[in-house]
């Protein structure tokens, strides 16, 4: 089975190709929109994805050394994400499905991150941290679905860091040589400032931390503010994670999503693993951020259990939660 996956939920347009036997991932091509200033504007994302889609599709097929006719199914991330960006990927997927008579596989973007994590880390039954620009979730698989034990009550961890560095003119770009701008700034900081620390059960709140940190700009060294906001945010995340580990008694902790690429977070998680005698499984950097390969792979799993959708019912779902998705391929 060969599945072509299309990712366009936010700033990245990606096309991946997966098959149902090793090496599983045959291609993983993408192009990310980087704003010249400010944040991501939906109209700019739509334009970027529309312009990049043909080139990225062609590159993926060339990388896998196949033609579109060799593909069995077309998988597409229908959500969650930014509406105009999602529509580009969905439109391309529908067009390919109709033109080449290929069944369409609906994929939840978050499930894509989780499933590529299972594949690349070889985790068996983990507690899962899904950390990205749009999501901060603590989850695990139980009785047919991924059940959420904790999540952000407002903005996501990645979004909080992005907004801060943008507001203080450290970004864009947000990622420089594989490091987030807040990590680079934090390297010269050492003073831990007093900022809000909000953990409620296994849920977290980052909006107050962001607001308070911005109010300190001009009053404290920027490097110390960056250091403090990062350390406090990560410590909040680790406390909520420890509570979930105590509740579930899991012996594996899998981390997926773009924030998983943070070196400083990885070090904290490794320390947590030693303290709790838990194996830490972190998705490789090349699969941490948004990519088409994870959509293709999750689509392959879904297709193996007959999960398809009619083209005329393939609506985008910008607020599609991970715990709303049935997972028939997992026991």
Curated annotation (Swiss-Prot):
Source taxon at top rank: Archaea
Database matches in InterPro entries: ATPase_NBD, Gcp-like_dom, KAE1/TsaD, Kae1_archaea_euk
Name the UniProt record assigns to this protein: tRNA N6-adenosine threonylcarbamoyltransferase
One GO molecular-function entry: N(6)-L-threonylcarbamoyladenine synthase activity
Reactions performed catalytically: L-threonylcarbamoyladenylate + adenosine(37) in tRNA = N(6)-L-threonylcarbamoyladenosine(37) in tRNA + AMP + H(+)
Cofactor: binding comment: Binds 1 Fe(2+) ion per subunit.
Cellular compartment(s): Cytoplasm
Cofactor (UniProt): Fe(2+)
């Amino acid at each position: 089975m060969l599945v072509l996956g299309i990712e366009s939920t936010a700033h990245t347009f990606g096309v991946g190709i997966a098959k149902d036997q090793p090496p599983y991932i045959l291609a993983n091509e993408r192009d990310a929109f980087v704003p010249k200033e400010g944040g991501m504007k939906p109209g700019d994302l739509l334009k970027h994805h529309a312009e990049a889609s043909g080139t990225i599709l062609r590159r993926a097929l060339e990388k896998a050394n196949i033609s579109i006719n060799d593909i069995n199914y077309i998988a597409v991330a229908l959500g969650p994400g930014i509406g105009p960006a999602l529509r580009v990927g969905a439109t391309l997927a529908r067009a390919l499905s109709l033109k080449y008579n290929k069944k369409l596989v609906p994929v939840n973007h978050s499930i894509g991150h989780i499933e590529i994590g299972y594949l690349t880390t070889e985790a068996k039954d983990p507690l899962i941290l899904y950390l990205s620009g749009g999501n901060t979730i603590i989850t695990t698989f139980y009785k047919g679905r991924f059940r959420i034990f904790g999540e952000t009550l407002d903005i996501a961890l990645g979004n909080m860091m992005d907004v801060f560095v943008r507001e203080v003119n450290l970004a864009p770009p947000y990622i420089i040589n594989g490091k987030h701008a807040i990590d680079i700034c934090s390297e010269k900081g050492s003073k831990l400032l007093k900022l809000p620390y909000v953990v409620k059960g296994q849920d977290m709140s980052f909006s107050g931390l962001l607001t308070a940190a911005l109010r300190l700009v001009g009053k404290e060294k920027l490097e110390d503010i960056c250091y403090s906001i990062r350390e406090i945010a990560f410590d909040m995340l680790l406390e909520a994670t420890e509570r979930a580990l105590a509740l579930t008694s899991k012996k594996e902790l899998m981390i997926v999503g773009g924030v998983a690429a943070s070196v400083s977070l990885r070090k904290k998680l490794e320390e947590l693993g030693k303290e709790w005698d838990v194996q830490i499984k972190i998705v490789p950097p090349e699969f941490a951020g948004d990519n088409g390969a994870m959509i293709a792979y999750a689509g392959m799993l879904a297709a193996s259990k007959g999960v398809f959708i009619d083209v005329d019912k393939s609506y985008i779902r910008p607020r599609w939660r991970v715990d709303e998705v049935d997972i028939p391929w997992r026991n």
